A protein has these predicted regions:
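Structured loops at beta-to-helix junctions and adjacent beta-edge loops in soluble globular domains
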Residues: 52, 79, 100-102, 119, ...
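Generic structural motif
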Residues: 53-56, 81-83, 102-106, 161, ...
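Solvent-exposed loop and beta-edge segments used for protein-protein assembly and interaction
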Residues: 41-43, 89-93, 148
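Short, structured protein-protein interaction patches enriched in aromatics and acidic/basic residues
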Residues: 68-102
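Interaction-surface and assembly-scaffold signal
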Residues: 2-30, 129-275
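Hydrophobic alpha-helical segments and helix pairs
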Residues: 98-132
Length: 275
């Protein structure tokens, strides 16, 4: 007799590998009898900077069907999250890269932010985000931000190689949170055996509304410095092309930078498949 824990995909519950042990718990599926309050979780502290850059180089990061929207700007944001309900109060950190873009599919178009890559420092959100949502998540070491005098410093590293550092200073109260959506992603899963082909290749959308996040405080930075170190293959064997492409972008002008703190959010179960 089959074990009911392993009824498998198609029974209305969320599964991820390994499937032999029953439905997968995570941000969009809690243990039986438990529910998470989106108004109370997570607590998030963010630091961001938006830079004007070269339109030609930035456009090379967009998939087919996408075009730059407005001025050529690339946004880097560090998020430090704690008190996450689905992790039983634990947390993790994240670095996102976003590009204002328009996606056209058929006769429709969507204005939003294309997110070519996301770094996180914990396995669980990486797997659930890649497989369920189509977010392009990969791993990096993202230590806690450091504060010295009036400056905040955020760093991203991979096995000892520091590939990105953001410094913000001379902050003045106010400015609000960074606009959070809609966010567009290209979900891609390669085919087994048929190497070079895809089992999945389509665009997904994270809607901008529906979050119960409340802004606690915010500040605008008057000083902003971003350093992207170009890695050799030996430094980042599987990610050097990713970081190298970002390092190619000239940082012409910081058009906006700041910090903010929020509490609450949403589980992203409103994610939409396009195409």
């Amino acid at each position: 007799m089959a074990d009911p824990r392993n009824a498998g995909p198609g029974d209305g519950r969320l599964y991820r590998m390994p499937t032999a042990f029953g439905p997968a718990l995570g941000p969009r599926q809690a243990p039986a009898g438990m529910c998470h309050d989106p108004a109370a979780s997570p607590r998030k502290s963010c630091a961001y900077a938006a830079w004007r850059t070269d339109a030609g180089l930035l456009g090379e990061l967009l998939p087919p069907g996408f075009a730059l929207r407005g001025e050529a700007v690339v946004v880097f944001e560090f998020s430090y999250m704690t008190d996450i309900a689905w992790l039983a109060g634990r947390g993790y950190n994240m670095l996102t890269v976003r590009i204002p873009a328009t996606y056209r599919h058929g006769d429709a178009s969507v204005d939003g932010y294309f997110q070519p890559v996301v770094w996180e420092n914990l396995t669980e959100p990486i797997l659930s985000g890649r497989e369920e949502l189509g977010w392009a998540k990969i791993y990096a070491d993202l230590p806690a931000a450091t504060h010295k005098h009036d400056e905040i410093v955020c760093r991203a590293e991979w096995m000892g190689f520091r590939f990105l550092e953001l410094r913000l200073g001379a902050r003045a109260a106010g400015g609000g949170a960074l606009q959070s959506g809609p966010v567009l992603h290209r979900k891609y899963i390669p085919a087994t055996q048929h190497w070079g082909q895809a089992d999945v290749d389509y665009v997904t959308l994270t809607p901008g509304g529906g979050s119960q996040a409340r802004l606690l405080e915010s500040a605008t930075a008057q000083r902003c410095a971003l350093r992207i170190a170009r890695p050799r293959w030996e430094d980042m064997p599987t990610q050097h092309a990713i970081v190298g492409a970002l390092a190619d972008l000239p940082l012409l002008e910081c058009v906006r930078a700041g910090t903010y703190q929020t509490v609450g959010g949403k589980d992203l179960s409103d994610q939409v498949r396009l195409g």
